[in-house]
């Protein structure tokens, strides 16, 4: 590619509305342009990277035995009603009607469509297992699109769906997808982790996320220092403390706390250790519990894990916190004065709360707290469950080592769906025993456009993007100095350009009539890994300058050795 015949579209200034570095650099490098909130046009440089990612994904999916299909973006509403997700999915599902007043959706995912297809095409266990994938545009009406293509409303995704008659068969395909995903992200030279995760709205029994480690990530990922345990913080179990509850040393007393409506204010004003305080959170109770609200207790320095709380049978789904009006109607006090003593509601305490002694909590009277609370003496120990997020230093759930926490960007997710969709949609085959059997399913997603942003978050400096070779828009940039005035510079540039292309190298020749500083800055900004600078002075000694974008080192290479040298440097 020649810059004179290419839309480079680089920008010097950082856009004011771009929050994260990947969004800033994708705009500055001329990869994307915003059309509307959460909607982006991909420019040539962006498309080149997107296609490189897409090709790696496709190759590894084919290697793993998956079969490519293409399904419509527009899906009839009756499939979503049949699966039960029409009501469950919420406002992120964009719904509309056609001219015949028939309801449709723009697909955020394709479980319903593929299940509908396969129940009409497959009728015997002999035809299974099968795994189908597509790389296609999806749409989710995000309430707050942000971070550029990281959380866009329209995005490119690889989604795959497998069908089986046994759990063992599903596990085999699940393991194959796990391996394929690991190969995909390894080929892209990304620093990633596969972590245990919650199944979320997709459903199912088991799931792993593939997280690219980056400080800008939205997810907290926990790792064990003593094993290969890794999980999303939403999923990680907080083990019960091993030490027994300390005996009571304080008397129960009620204290005036008119200016302490939060744990932080209570700790500051009364010099209490925060680990000696308890937060009482009221949420809506499950309708079958016979109560409107249920109280959840976590230690003052811990955060409630809403995913864990929502799974409790006593808690309504989705988890909803009680409003101040509901709290006052039930308790007679505001949210800042709640506590477990004399509380006339069902109570569930976190495991760490169950071993506390001499702790402080609200007195269920505005402006008052109890100090010196002790279980069994002042109130009965309630139901105990794992309610909190783990913190650094916790014992790993597998009992090996302690936990560390890092930030991650989710780029892939695999699920064992089981029969959630096939049962709801009556997707059956004739089993080995001659009877109809509901198929078991798995699903496997990669955010193709999100991978591009995640790679930038992990590979950049103050001059621009530093692409891994495998997904760079161009592998080599040829920068001829004053080629329009020097015949031998132009001749070598053209010869090198032709030769590299004949070797299958993606190369960009900067043939613009631009100052060298502009040419260097643009190639650094768009992240070309290998740069060759051709100048008259160096040609006197039959040399050119090579610069590696990642390490920043320059070295002189003989003109007769350039091609061989570049082929040895490029990771292919």
Curated annotation (Swiss-Prot):
EC number: 6.1.1.15
Reaction catalysis annotation: tRNA(Pro) + L-proline + ATP = L-prolyl-tRNA(Pro) + AMP + diphosphate
Pfam families, A to Z: HGTP_anticodon, tRNA-synt_2b, tRNA_edit
Protein keywords: Aminoacyl-tRNA synthetase, ATP-binding, Cytoplasm, Ligase, Nucleotide-binding, Protein biosynthesis
Transport among keywords: no
MF-aspect GO terms: aminoacyl-tRNA deacylase activity; ATP binding; proline-tRNA ligase activity
Enzyme class, broadest EC rank: ligase
Domain of life: Bacteria
Subunit description: Homodimer.
Domain free text: Consists of three domains: the N-terminal catalytic domain, the editing domain and the C-terminal anticodon-binding domain.
Record-given protein name: Proline--tRNA ligase
Organism: Yersinia pseudotuberculosis serotype O:1b (strain IP 31758)
Taxonomic lineage of the native organism: Bacteria, Pseudomonadati, Pseudomonadota, Gammaproteobacteria, Enterobacterales
Primary gene name: proS
């Amino acid at each position: 590619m020649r810059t004179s015949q290419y839309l480079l579209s680089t920008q010097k200034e950082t856009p004011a509305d771009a929050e994260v570095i990947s969004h800033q650099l994708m705009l500055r490098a001329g990869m994307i342009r915003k059309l509307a909130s959460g909607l982006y046009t991909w420019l040539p440089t962006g498309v080149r990277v997107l296609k490189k990612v897409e090709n790696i994904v496709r190759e590894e999916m084919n290697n793993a035995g998956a079969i490519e299909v293409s399904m419509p973006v527009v899906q009839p509403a009756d499939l979503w009603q049949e699966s039960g997700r029409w009501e469950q999915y919420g406002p992120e599902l964009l719904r509309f009607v056609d001219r015949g007043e028939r309801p449709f959706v723009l697909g955020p995912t394709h479980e319903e469509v593929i299940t509908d297809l396969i129940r009409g095409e497959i009728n015997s266990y002999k035809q299974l297992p099968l795994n189908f994938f597509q790389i296609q545009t999806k749409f989710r009406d995000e309430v707050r699109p942000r971070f550029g293509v990281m959380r866009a409303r329209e995005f490119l995704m690889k989604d795959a769906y497998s069908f089986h008659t046994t759990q063992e068969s599903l596990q085999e395909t699940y393991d194959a997808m796990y391996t394929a995903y690991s190969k995909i992200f390894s080929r892209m030279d990304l620093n990633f982790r596969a972590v245990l995760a919650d199944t979320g709205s997709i459903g199912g029994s088991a799931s792993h996320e593939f997280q690219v480690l980056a400080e800008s990530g939205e997810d907290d990922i926990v790792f064990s220092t003593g094993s290969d345990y890794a999980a999303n913080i939403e999923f990680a179990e907080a083990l019960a403390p091993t030490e027994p509850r300390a005996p009571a040393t304080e008397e129960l007393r009620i204290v005036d706390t008119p200016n302490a409506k939060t744990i932080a204010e209570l700790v500051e004003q009364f010099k209490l250790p925060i680990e000696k305080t308890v937060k009482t959170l009221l949420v809506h109770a499950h309708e079958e519990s016979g109560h409107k609200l249920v109280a959840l207790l976590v230690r003052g320095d811990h955060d409630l894990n809403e995913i864990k709380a929502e799974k409790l049978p006593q808690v309504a789904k989705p988890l909803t916190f009680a409003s101040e009006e509901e709290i006052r109607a039930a308790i007679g006090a505001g949210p800042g004065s709640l506590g477990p003593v004399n509380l006339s509601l069902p109570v569930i305490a976190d495991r760490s709360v169950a071993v506390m002694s001499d702790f402080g909590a609200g007195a269920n009277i505005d402006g008052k707290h109890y100090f010196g609370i002790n279980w069994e003496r002042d109130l009965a120990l309630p139901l105990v469950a794992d309610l909190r997020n783990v913190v650094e230093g916790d014992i790993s759930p597998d009992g090996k080592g302690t936990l560390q926490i890092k930030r991650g960007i989710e780029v892939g997710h695999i699920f064992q769906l089981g029969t959630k969709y096939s049962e709801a949609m009556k997707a059956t085959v004739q089993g080995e025993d001659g009877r109809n059997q509901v198929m078991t399913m798995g699903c496997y997603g990669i955010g193709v456009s999100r991978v591009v942003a995640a790679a930038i978050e992990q590979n950049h400096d103050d001059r621009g993007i530093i692409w891994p070779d495998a997904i760079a828009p161009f592998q080599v940039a040829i920068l001829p100095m004053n080629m329009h005035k020097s015949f031998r510079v132009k001749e070598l540039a053209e010869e090198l350009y032709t030769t590299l292309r004949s070797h299958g190298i993606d190369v960009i020749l900067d043939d613009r009539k631009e100052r060298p500083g502009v040419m260097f800055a643009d190639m650094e900004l768009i992240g070309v890994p290998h740069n060759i600078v051709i100048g008259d002075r160096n040609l006197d000694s039959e040399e050119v300058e090579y610069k590696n974008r990642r390490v920043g080192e320059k070295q002189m290479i003989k003109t007769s050795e350039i091609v061989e040298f570049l082929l040895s440097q490029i990771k292919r």
